[in-house]
Amino acid sequence: MSKGESVDRRRAIKRTVALGVSMGTLGAMNSGPLRANEFESIKTAIKPSNPIADLVIVGAGNAGIPAAIQAADLGVRVLLVDKNPFIGGMLNISGGHISGADSKLQIEKGIEDSPALHYRDAMRMGKYSNNSELLKIAVENAAAMIDWLAEIGVEFTPESPFFEDDHEHYSSARTYMGPDYGRSLLGPLRTELEKRIDRGDIKLLLRAKVTKLLQDDSGTVTGIAVDDDSGKASDFMAKAVILTTGGYGASQVLKEKYNPKIAKSKVVCLPHASGDGLIMAQQAGAELINMGHFVSFPGAIDGARGRLMFPPKHYPQGIWVNKQGERFVNEHAINPDERERAFLAQTDFGYFMILDKKSKINNEIGVKDWDQQQLDRQVSSGIVKKAQSIRGLGRKMGIPVQQLVKTVTEYNRSVVTGVDEKFNRQRLDSPIDEGPFYSIPITGSILISHGGVAVNHLLQAVESSGKVIDGLYAAGEAAAGMHGANR
């Protein structure tokens, strides 16, 4: 390779990571993971005899795959590595929500928007603590990313772009999703990846666990150390390494270290989200930032499958009480951030939904896919508590009985007067006054984490001093700072 070609490839490596920022944040859970045999046609064994690549990308998920494709199209030889037997990472279970201003589809629908407005909204949602440089890269590349996804065959729902109710609304309709959620993105991305593997531009290693970043005496990252699924160790050298390894929601050790309060939250991310890449980056000298900032969504059933349904799609008939027996939020609040902030202030991220007989009879239980029979099954299991009186329910729940009685009495009075003086809930359809009464325990669920590797505007990993670690980049969920305090 000539000196000029080498310089061009280094420039291409720096350019390729921008797409990874835009692809790095997707939404809520859905369908199950892809089977390992779906990728047998492109799976490659580790071959130490051919260890050289221009670029190693660790993590074949929603940031790593687009980065690999982009790099290959720029003439970079790519080694894409993942410890799973499948590709896609969280795309296999996520809702696949992506956002962008001024996409072709948005313009065709006559929706007025701009990257500047997107930036302004994202800063507001992040409580103005976002890394502004990273955020600008993301919003300025977002429309091109969405257009590219459409070009390669991603199908978006007829409603896209739309206002997403699962988080605070943007000022314009700019959220997109596919009919098969995250898998709607993964299918076409897999096809594009296979094309470049077949051309010899990308080498894919699955079931390959990266154990260490290799560095020379100056600290420059020069490659990775890998163990295959048989335990065989190999080193792979490269001009640069991009970490797209995702977050650490599945690591009990890291959660207890950085934010013990959320350690009991239900893990809904895949087991691979164990923070491996972050730990390796830290060992190589990179600073980790925002590590205490997890996104712990309220609504998971503590001890059982299922999740609460929220306004505006569902308005619960019961009330929510904390472990002190008190209401703590307007259960019908349209803004999910209002509910989440109130939830995050609760002890151990836990609370209870209180219902009565009428909610069961009317199938107004408020838990996705739960009917009367499922409620009865969970009572039998001991997860849901049932009693003929509120006083008896409080005793079974193990919370202050007198306070629970007072809370329910106050709520029932609000139904009669039509005024919720405490939280201004508007829909006061029915009192909680007909036994048996039920208590469903609710906890948080962790899908993504916002802490990770500190990076500069080129997504180069940096030390706490701000010094760049040559040869090391991070993108997607592994790179921290873009989201600020956004939930």
Q: What does each model-found stretch correspond to?
A:
Residues 2-20:
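N-terminal secretory signal peptides and thylakoid transit peptides that target proteins
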Residues 5, 28-62, 72-74:
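C-terminal segment of N-terminal export signals and the immediately downstream linker at the start
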Residues 236-307:
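Glycine-rich loop(s) and the adjacent beta-strand/alpha-helix scaffold that form part
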Residues 74-91:
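Glycine-rich FAD pyrophosphate-binding loop
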Residues 278-280, 286-397:
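An anion/pyrophosphate-binding glycine-rich loop and adjacent beta-alpha core
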Residues 140-232, 251-254, 301, 415-434:
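Conserved redox-cofactor binding core of oxidoreductases
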Residues 51-53, 231-240:
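Core beta-strand elements of the Rossmann-like FAD/NAD(P) dinucleotide-binding domain
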Residues 403-486:
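A glycine-rich dinucleotide-binding beta-alpha-beta segment and adjacent secondary-structure elements
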